[in-house]
Each structure stands twice: as C-alpha cells, then as structure tokens.
Amino acid sequence: MTNLSCTAFLAEHIQNLKIAVIGDVMLDRYFYGEVKRISPEAPVPVNKVKRIKSVLGGAANVAANLAHLECRVFMGGVTGADNNREVLEAMMAEKGIDYSGLIKSQQRETITKMRILGAQQQMLRLDFEETGDLFPEETEALSLWLQNLLE
C-alpha cells in the first residue's frame, strides 16, 4: 500500500478506530507574564503573571490528538489523587476521551510540568513527578483495565 493510499484509507476509516493510549499522563501549565524588574531578594527576574493556560501533556496529548481525528480513545495511566487529576479528567471529558483507565494513586502526585514565560521566552520549567517505576498495585490495576477493555 502506498503512502497516498494508506492516507486515503485512514481518512476514510479513522472514525471507526478504537485506540487505547497508555503512558505518562501529564498536565502542562503555562504561566505567561511580563518582566519589568529584578527581585530585591535575589538577582532574578520578577514575572508578573498575566495569563495561565493548562493543556493535556505527554500521553494525554497523544490521546487528545487522536480524539481530534474523531477516533474513539481510551486513556490509561497513573495519576495522583489530587486537583491536577481533576483538571485532566475535565479536559479529557471535554474532548470525548474515555479516561476510565486513569489509575488514582495515593503514592504519587499527578505529573505536572509548569513553564514560566516572560517576553515570549521560557524562563523556567518546574517538574512535579515521581520518576520511579510504577508500584505493583498500580501496574496490576492498569493491566486489569486493559484486559477488560480488550474483552
């Protein structure tokens, strides 16, 4: 099948695809501001935040892109039992993503990447995440979700 015929086939049948996306579910937050002075406490710029934007990141961004193509998307991953998870759930629901595979962990926080931007330039990124392997109960819950999805 040539690239052109493959593309045409996908365009015609993509709405019928059911796709499970499993991976690191992240909340990406952008703090847009302006810098007009240096802090008196330390020689660092003071960013006066004017706007905050939150978007789906990591595997959740992949799921959002597939949902935009009108695929039926099922999201699997591990998040914390926190407010950022609730933000992710609301954003996924708005995009029609089935997030029943999000495992709520009491042992970790939802991965969040915060970017501080001033004068159209990224000044700093803060990462909130547990970088170790999944805990056995998280892996088991995710596997069970996937098995049920495939039945």
What are these regions (language model features)?
Residues N16-I19, I38-P45, L134:
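Mobile, glycine- and charge-enriched loop segments
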Residues M1-K36:
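Positively charged, low-complexity intrinsically disordered leader regions
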Residues I22, G76-V78, L117:
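Short hydrophobic segments within beta-strands
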Residues Y32-E41, L117:
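Short, flexible, mixed-charge acidic loops at enzyme active sites
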Residues L10-N16, A67, L146-E151:
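Glycine-rich phosphate/diphosphate-binding loops that line cofactor/substrate pockets in enzymes
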Residues M26, A42, G80, Q121, ...:
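Short, glycine/serine-rich, charged loops/turns that create anion-binding
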Residues N3-L10, P40, V44-T112:
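Substrate-binding N-lobe of the ribokinase-like
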Residues S100-R108, R115-L150:
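Conserved phosphate-binding/catalytic loop of the ribokinase/pfkB sugar-kinase fold
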